């Protein structure tokens, strides 16, 4: 079977790029499919994640829209970019004659309804629809897609006019080590240092609990445009010796077991892959009830604590509750291991195979 995956920029190191690359690799190596990844923006920069031998990669080399021009100029350039994108992508589709095309992210949604092909068209939603750029332009895609795949049941409710909507969560590799040390008074948070991840809120919450728990330390892993602002916030709150911005880890799954508590303050998520990773490593989680995914993964009082969005006082109280009890962390962490196993690749990938077999009929 010939499969095409679209992706906006294969050189970006993010959760969506990681999971798309893993799926392409698995389809090629384990099932023998002919897989092509079409990167819209990529030029000569290397792919952010390794590609299997059977996966081909081409770039449409669509230029980025300049940020320093006025609104009229931006809109004109945006139209030119989209027309160029449609033309170049159609040329690839005509040459490849795929059986299935997986469209991903915002530009994928814009491409889908205009692509002329006999292939089945599948749109993958990697972020909650209402928080996705250009989501108001998704209606043609909704009507044109053969299937829309969402990460959560909450996001699936956003698509009402599609022939078929299904829910397939992200998957993770089974960790080499999945026993956390619950005696350690160290908490971890992971994600891009960008506004949607809510690390500014987390730092404020940590200030509230710092005096009550002077022996606890918070490490934040990730990089992004907000790093300098977050570092300044840490310094202004005199938390330099209590919070560390650790940068990006090459293998975060080896890092989680060094901690006894996972924290997530996202304002919204597609699903929350770092939450799944932490659970699979036996870490209890304190999370905001972000849209969407928290309630799909965390059962309040079983494998973590869920707090209503942006309630910093309640979040700080939940942190104190977890930090004060090693027994609670151990109990919730053991339950988290069971939850994490549900998202191992071997337990999830069969749903993708089932979807492809259904589309072939």
Specify the residue positions occupied by each region the protein language model found.
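N-terminal strand-loop element at the rim of the active site
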Residues: 5-13, 26-79
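A conserved mid-protein helix/loop that constitutes part of the nucleotide-sugar donor-binding site
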Residues: 14-22, 185, 192-208, 225-231, ...
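Short His-centered aromatic/hydrophobic patch
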Residues: 85, 103-109
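Donor nucleotide-sugar binding/catalytic pocket of nucleotide-sugar-dependent glycosyltransferases
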Residues: 126, 130, 143-177
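Aromatic "clamp/platform" in nucleotide-sugar-dependent glycosyltransferases that forms part
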Residues: 248, 267
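Short hydrophobic beta-strand element within catalytic cores of glycosyltransferases
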Residues: 284-288
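Conserved acidic donor-binding segment of nucleotide-sugar-dependent glycosyltransferases
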Residues: 289, 299-301, 305-312, 321-326
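A short, well-ordered alpha-helix in the C-terminal region of glycosyltransferases
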Residues: 314, 321, 328-342, 351-354
């Amino acid at each position: 079977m010939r499969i095409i995956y679209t992706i906006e920029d294969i050189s970006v190191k993010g959760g969506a790029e990681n999971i798309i690359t893993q799926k392409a690799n698995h389809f090629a190596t384990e099932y023998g499919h002919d897989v092509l990844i079409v990167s819209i923006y990529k030029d000569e920069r290397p792919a952010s994640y390794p590609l299997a031998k059977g996966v081909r990669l081409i770039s449409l080399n669509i230029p980025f829209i300049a940020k320093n021009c006025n609104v009229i100029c931006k809109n004109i350039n945006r139209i030119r970019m989209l027309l160029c994108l449609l033309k170049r992508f159609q040329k690839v589709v005509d040459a490849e004659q795929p059986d299935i095309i997986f469209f991903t992210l915002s530009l994928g949604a814009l491409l889908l309804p205009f692509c002329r092909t006999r292939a089945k068209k599948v749109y993958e939603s990697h972020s909650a629809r209402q928080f996705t750029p250009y989501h108001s332009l998704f209606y043609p895609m909704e009507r044109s897609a053969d299937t829309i795949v969402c990460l959560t049941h909450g996001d699936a409710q956003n698509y009402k006019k599609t022939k078929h909507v299904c829910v397939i969560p992200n998957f993770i590799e089974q960790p080499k080590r999945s026993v956390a040390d619950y005696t350690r008074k160290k908490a971890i948070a992971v994600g891009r240092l960008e506004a949607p991840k809510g690390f500014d809120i987390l730092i404020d919450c940590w200030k509230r609990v710092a005096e009550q728990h002077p022996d606890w330390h918070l490490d934040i892993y990730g990089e992004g445009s907000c790093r300098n602002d977050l570092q300044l916030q840490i310094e202004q709150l005199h938390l330099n010796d209590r919070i560390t911005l650790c940068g990006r880890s090459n293998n975060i799954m080896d890092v989680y077991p060094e901690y006894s508590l996972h924290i997530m303050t996202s304002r919204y998520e597609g699903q929350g892959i770092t939450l799944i990773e932490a659970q699979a490593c036996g870490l209890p989680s304190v999370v905001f009830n972000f849209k969407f995914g928290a309630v799909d993964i965390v059962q309040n009082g079983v494998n973590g604590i869920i707090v209503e969005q942006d309630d910093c006082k309640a979040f700080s109280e939940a942190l104190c509750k977890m930090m004060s009890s090693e027994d609670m962390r151990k109990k919730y962490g053991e339950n988290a291991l069971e939850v994490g196993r549900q998202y191992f690749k071997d337990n999830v990938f069969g749903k993708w195979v089932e979807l492809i077999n259904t589309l072939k009929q």
